[in-house]
């Protein structure tokens, strides 16, 4: 186990998460008692208590007053906020994790973009207008791409879509900085944003589904060609 956290709390959090991931503390089992665990990790009980509360909020653990702390099956109890942690824990699965992330984005965006165009076209156009001023480099495009999908999600009038995109932000933008280093990817994205703006202006809601699906397919092809050169910083390092 290699832990790169700098603070005691960060170290304790990584130690426990990696122990759950590696089945040292398997799902469904009980964590060691607080005193034993704090000595094992080398942190104070106060620090450990704070870490356990945070891990419980993220779905890794279940804490019940007067009962031992239980290790959860995090696939069933955690949310999108653990995506970056999963990427750090299992480097070999990062490409599949990102494929799944982008597939979800495409599937739900066909719904919320169409709804945004139908119900709040002015707001949607305002979101898409940012594409007219983006600088031609990877960081700017990664930020723009995230803000456009997030903005259109909230413009749909259903904030749950926006919260889902929020939950993807860390891994999404890290992936975007690598993907948009490719000029072909930036060109494809600009064409997509401009096409969406045109559809919104024309009220052509029925064409949104096919436009988004096509972009998902074409951008996916570029991404798959780039996967063999994934940078190490796609996974979060310790705190």
UniProtKB/Swiss-Prot annotation:
Which of UniProt's keywords are assigned here? Activator, Cytoplasm, DNA-binding, Fatty acid metabolism, Lipid metabolism, Repressor, Transcription, Transcription regulation
The main location is: cytoplasm
**Biological process (GO), any one:** regulation of fatty acid metabolic process
Organism superkingdom = Bacteria
Q: List the disulfide bonds.
A: none
One GO MF term? DNA-binding transcription factor activity
Task: Identify the Pfam families for this entry.
Answer: FadR_C, GntR
Keyword Repressor among UniProt keywords: yes
Where's it found, cell-wise? Answer: Cytoplasm
Domain HTH gntR-type: residue ranges: 6-74
CDD domains linked to this entry: WHTH_GntR
Record bears the keyword Repressor: yes
Gene Ontology CC: one annotated term = cytoplasm
Q: Which residues bind DNA?
A: 34-53
Instruction: Cite the record's note on assembly.
Output: Homodimer.
Matching HAMAP family: HTH_FadR (MF_00696)
- Function of the protein: Multifunctional regulator of fatty acid metabolism.
Q: What is this protein called?
A: Fatty acid metabolism regulator protein
Specify the species.
Escherichia fergusonii (strain ATCC 35469 / DSM 13698 / CCUG 18766 / IAM 14443 / JCM 21226 / LMG 7866 / NBRC 102419 / NCTC 12128 / CDC 0568-73)
Identify the coding gene.
fadR
């Amino acid at each position: 186990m290699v832990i790169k956290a700098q603070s005691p709390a960060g170290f304790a959090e990584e130690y426990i998460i990696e122990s759950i991931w590696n089945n040292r503390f398997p799902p469904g089992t009980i964590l060691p008692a607080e005193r034993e665990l704090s000595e094992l990790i080398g942190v104070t009980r106060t620090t450990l208590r704070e870490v356990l509360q945070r891990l419980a909020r993220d779905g890794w653990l279940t804490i019940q007053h007067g009962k031992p702390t239980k290790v959860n099956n995090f696939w069933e109890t955690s949310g999108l906020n653990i995506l970056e942690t999963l990427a750090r824990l299992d480097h070999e699965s990062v490409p599949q994790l990102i494929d799944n992330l982008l597939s979800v984005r495409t599937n739900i965006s066909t719904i919320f973009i169409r709804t945004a165009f139908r119900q709040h076209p002015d707001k949607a156009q305002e979101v898409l207008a940012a594409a007219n001023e983006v600088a031609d480099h990877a960081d700017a495009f990664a930020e723009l791409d995230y803000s456009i999908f997030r903005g259109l999600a909230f413009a749909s009038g259903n904030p749950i879509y926006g919260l889902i995109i929020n939950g993807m932000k860390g891994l999404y933008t890290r992936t975007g900085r690598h993907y948009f280093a490719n000029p072909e990817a930036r060109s494809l994205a600009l064409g997509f944003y401009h096409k969406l703006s045109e559809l919104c202006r024309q009220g052509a809601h029925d064409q949104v589904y096919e436009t988004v699906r096509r972009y998902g397919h074409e951008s996916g092809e570029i991404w798959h060609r780039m996967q063999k050169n994934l940078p190490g910083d796609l996974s979060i390092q310790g705190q």
